[in-house]
Amino acid sequence: MKRFKKVLALVLAGVLALAMLTACDGTTTDPDKIMPEDGTPEVVMTVNNMAANKGLGQVKYSAKYSAVTKALLENWLEYTNNKINNTTYWENYRKITAELGSVKIVVGMTSDYRPGTSDHNPASKTSFKYDSLFKDESTFNLAEKIGVAYVPTSNGTVYQAVCLFDVN
């Protein structure tokens, strides 16, 4: 029994040493499992809590779709700051969303979205209204993934956008 314990201790020490040498700390490399510390975890939690309160499904964070949401938000900011016209806004929108393939934006800056309207998504971070995500609960239930984006402007205002994606 003593010999078994010694062998077990040596094996465990070897495993520990190997883990340290290979820098294996057990953390994930999946970008969707690591949310940026910019308020994104709180947004995802708020959206999922509101959905649960309404009896709706949950959405999972996606780094890929957050990048799409950010590109759409930047395009929206250019339009609202009169740097591009309506035609250019929609050309850019189509280019950004073409990368999605069969994935559809079902809530947020959809193809039905009108950039001049004020539905509080996108909006400045302080005036963002989560209720805007639940206007049509049937479309919310189509979503599996959430994209969250923030873009700071030169005047210090941070804008936020949330898009929900149907990936199936």
Q: Where do the model's predicted regions map?
A:
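A well-ordered secondary-structure block
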Residues: 92-168
